[in-house]
Amino acid sequence: MGSRRVTVHHATGWDGTRLHYELSGQPLGAAPVALLNNGIGCAGYVWKYLRPLLEQHCTVLHWHYRGHGHSGEAPDGAQYTIEDCVRDMEAVMDAAEVESALVFGHSMGVQVSVESALMLPERVGGLVLLCGSHGNPLDTFQGTDRFRAFLPKIQQFVGENHMLVKLFMETFVNTRAGWWVARGEVDGRLMNREDFEPYLEHLSKMDPIVFLRLLESAAEHTTDDRLGDIAVPALVVGAERDGFTPYEVSERMAAAIPEGELLTIRGGSHTAPLEQPQLLEMAL
């Protein structure tokens, strides 16, 4: 296989936010488009093995949310919602001259992807929903809803100690200790630090206030009563040992989408696309 050709571009979001996106794989217009929606606090680490596979058959459009990666922050510092992400996704598609795409989402990217199929039905040709919820993820995080009650207190603490929290994240998150803590939520037998480190590195540099504002929106957002309106095929990937998105959430989502299909990753965690990429390759 030859070297990958990736071109870097920028779009302007609905409120003027500068948005980073990349095109790779097949020439635009010569193949279907696969659009990748990241999780919160992520800039694409989870697509390491899936993206090259897609590039063999598709034009891959990968972009960064506002306040993430190489994209800018919202001009007013406040507009960080799931719906804002969908509007930004539309702006990126417009800038790239992409009419319709097969939309992939991981973690919070599942919420963005599902909402995009409802807000932009003519732009979404299908969904691949990986290890994420269709709404209210903090109500099921680790099998309990207690984390949602903690969020306002965390937001208050970070707001009052912003620079201190930023310094802590910069010095602790992307360290051996940070990896040791993270291993408790992934399959340490199949996940190596090299694959996970880009996530820790990105998170360590992210503004915690931006992270929490988007997390607040994700916690309140749901499409639970609208899944039946999704008019495109959807492959829902659920991992048996996913503490962030319990497997039962994926089961319910797949059953509620008219053309939904469930793929089970036996023994997989929230980072199953990195732990067992061969299963996704066979399914896709």
Region roles according to the model:
Residues 17-74, 78:
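Conserved HGGG/HGGXW glycine-rich cap/lid loop of the alpha/beta-hydrolase fold
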Residues 52, 61-108, 282:
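Active-site loop/oxyanion-hole signature of alpha/beta-hydrolase fold enzymes
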Residues 265-281:
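Catalytic histidine-centered segment of alpha/beta-hydrolase-like enzymes
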Residues 38-40, 101, 105-110, 239:
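Conserved alpha/beta-hydrolase "nucleophile elbow" surrounding the catalytic nucleophile
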Residues 118, 125-166:
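Flexible "cap/lid" loop of the alpha/beta hydrolase fold
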Residues 138-143, 165-229:
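Conserved alpha/beta-hydrolase catalytic His-Asp/Glu region
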Residues 247-270:
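Catalytic histidine neighborhood in serine/cysteine hydrolases
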Residues 230, 236-238, 242:
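Short beta-strand/loop motif that positions the catalytic acidic residue
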